[in-house]
Regions:
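NAD(P)-dependent Rossmann-like dehydrogenase/reductase catalytic/cofactor-binding core
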Residues: 61-97, 256-259, 317, 325-581
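NAD(P)+-binding Rossmann beta1-loop-alpha1 motif at the extreme N-terminus of oxidoreductases
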Residues: 64-164
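Structural motif
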Residues: 3-4, 112-114, 141-143, 179-183, ...
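N-terminal chloroplast transit peptides
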Residues: 1-53
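Rossmann-fold dinucleotide-binding core
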Residues: 208-305, 406-442
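Small-residue helix-packing motif on alpha-helices
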Residues: 153, 174, 190, 272, ...
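Rossmann-like NAD(P)-binding element
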Residues: 65-72, 139, 147-151, 157-216, ...
């Protein structure tokens, strides 16, 4: 990753991957696997090799203070604050409406911010930026750029952006006329259109991304960004509707929103860090932490296929089927899976952490939790490990690009858009449960459900930790985004309402990986429990003493000042997911 420094702005990254200035690159060699002398390599499956590596990965509890990337940064406008997470020093910038008067200074040189796209993030970010800049009495124009003929023009007009006011227009005119271009179209569309986008950008303008996907795509082609523009990222740790909803809810409490990471990939004139931080503050981020563009896309694409979307979908499907097969009635099974995870379990983790979920159980409940946790941890990590390496190798990125092209007819084959994911019996039962749910009901705390879910959460934390991600990124991608931003949407109206309010990349990944978690839990974890296999006490001990719990306590103090409210008839979600009652 190319991190440029200047006198006004420096970024010290721990172990970035530097891209050559030009020319194709040799793909990295595949990771080698050594096999025991007694076992021919051809007889050791990839899954078995992963399981062996996984076992080595968690054979001892994580040490406090083990090496993690250094992500210090310099800002001339905002106050940088040092926090300690599990013995690691990191730096953040706290947000708040009281900082809005600083936005004109931080955005110095920016006369127009072009927001390109109107999907999940586009509407939220455009409206938040517009409202924050207006409160700061700034004359910076926020303009929406859409392709001609797009149905989103009407949605943008309804949100107050118009051609007459110069705040809505053609995508290419908007790119050419903007000093800061926020590229919020789908990842697949970015991959297919980046050359034209780059060619329309002004020299010394700033490209803003809310996901590092494009970097991963360029890396896979041996390419990089143009050298005459700055490249930054601000990545809210939640779907677009959450970004807007919490911003609106928090107007009276000094600004609430979604935590964001930021990265400076290229800085051509020393302004990039302050512009990125201003963008994040204007979105309403309670706190902003540093990452690299490469670390962001790896953790984000991986995370949404894991506990954020795909894995939690797979878990509740597997548990619902297990509970009903064991004789539990369907409504109780739904309550003890979806309602419990998105309700009492998420609420407890959000406010008090994972250990509080465990400590609130009875002695018998703790035994059941331990069985579920012990049996589920390694199977979940097996799939998570595979998923992370698919993302890091570029395989998952290529999958997203190709899937986007299959949305349209080509080569004589029909179009294959994404299908529904909430039409099975389980989700119809969920509709009935929600129709009679008392207001504020958080569902039951089922110890087996809690054990499986928290095993998944801890397995994801461990993968990201061993892959060198910072604790702020780990906790946001594995815990905070899940319980504070995404699960409330499934609680409100089921799995599709959660998944399909997210980006196309997230929606595709969730559909692809959810069945993998369902399968491995059913075929490995639950079978282990039913055989009454001994509990792995080392896993339980490691969970109880893991330093991540202390880091989560620190991050809990930086959470949004209000809890998100997601009514079933929410009007701040994707138009196709709205309902009248």
């Amino acid at each position: 990753m190319a991190a440029q420094t200047s006198a006004a702005s420096t970024l010290a990254f721990g172990h970035p991957k530097t891209l050559a200035a030009a020319g194709p690159k040799t793909p990295p060699a595949a990771a080698s696997v050594s096999f025991p002398a007694t076992q021919p390599a051809c007889l050791l499956s990839a899954s078995a090799a992963r399981r062996r590596d996984v076992a080595a990965m968690v054979s001892a509890p994580p040490a406090v203070g083990t090496a993690m990337p250094s992500l210090d940064f310099e800002t001339s406008v905002f106050k940088k604050e040092k926090v300690s997470l599990a013995g690691h020093e990191e730096y953040i910038v706290r947000g708040g409406r009281n900082l809005f008067p600083l936005l004109p200074e931080a955005f110095k040189g920016v006369k127009q911010i072009g927001v390109i796209g109107w999907g999940s993030q586009g509407p939220a970010q455009a409206q938040n930026l517009r409202d924050s800049l207006a409160e700061a009495k700034s004359d910076i124009v926020v303009k929406i750029g859409l392709r001609k003929g797009s149905k989103s023009f009407e949605e943008a007009r309804a949100a107050g952006f118009t051609e007459e006011s110069g705040t809505l227009g053609d995508i290419w005119e908007t790119v050419s006329g903007s000093d800061l271009v926020l590229l919020l179209i789908s990842d697949a569309a970015q991959a297919d259109n980046y050359e034209k986008i780059f060619s329309h950008m002004k020299p010394n303008s700033i490209l803003g991304l809310s996901h590092g996907f494009l970097l991963g795509h360029l890396q896979s082609l041996g390419l990089d960004f143009p050298k005459n523009i700055s490249v930054i990222a601000v990545c809210p740790k939640g779907m677009g509707p959450s970004v807007r909803r919490l911003y609106v809810q928090g107007k009276e409490v000094n600004g609430a929103g979604i935590n964001s990471s930021f990265a400076v990939h290229q800085d051509v004139d020393g302004r990039a860090t302050d512009v990125a931080l201003a963008w994040s503050v204007a979105l309403g981020s309670p706190f902003t932490f540093a990452t690299t563009l490469e670390q962001e896309y790896k953790s984000d694409i991986f995370g949404e296929r894991g506990i954020l979307l795909g894995a939690v979908h797979g878990i509740v499907e597997a548990l619902f089927r297990r509970y009903t097969e064991q004789g539990m009635d369907e409504e109780s099974a739904y309550k003890n899976t979806v309602e419990g995870i998105t309700g009492i379990i998420s609420k407890t983790i959000s406010k008090k952490g994972m250990l509080e979920v465990y400590n609130s159980l009875s002695e018998e409940g703790k035994k059941e939790f331990n069985k579920a946790y012990s049996a589920s941890f390694y199977p979940c990590m097996d799939i998570l490990y595979e998923c992370y390496e698919d993302v890091a190798s570029g395989s998952e990125i290529r999958s997203v690009v190709l899937a986007g092209r299959r949305f349209y007819e080509k080569e004589g084959l029909p179009a294959f858009p994404m299908g529904n994911i909430d039409q099975t019996r389980m989700w119809k039962v969920g509709e009935k449960v929600r129709s009679t749910r008392p207001e504020g009901d958080l569902g039951p705390l089922h110890p087996f459900t809690a054990g499986v879910y928290i095993a998944l959460m801890m397995a994801q934390i461990e993968i990201l930790r061993k892959k060198g991600h910072s604790y702020s990124e780990i906790i946001n991608e594995s815990v905070i985004e899940s319980v504070d931003s995404l699960n409330p949407f499934m609680h409100a109206r089921g799995v599709a309402f959660m998944v399909d309010n997210c980006s196309t990349t997230a929606r595709l990944g969730s559909r692809k990986w959810a069945p993998r978690f369902d399968y491995i839990l059913t075929q490995q974890a639950f079978v282990t429990v039913d055989k009454d296999a001994p509990i792995n006490q080392d896993l339980i001990s490691n969970f109880m003493s893991d330093p991540v719990h202390g880091a989560i306590e620190v991050c809990a103090e930086l959470r949004p000042t209000v809890d998100i409210s997601v009514p079933a008839n929410a009007d701040f979600v994707r138009p196709e997911l709205r309902q009248s009652s």
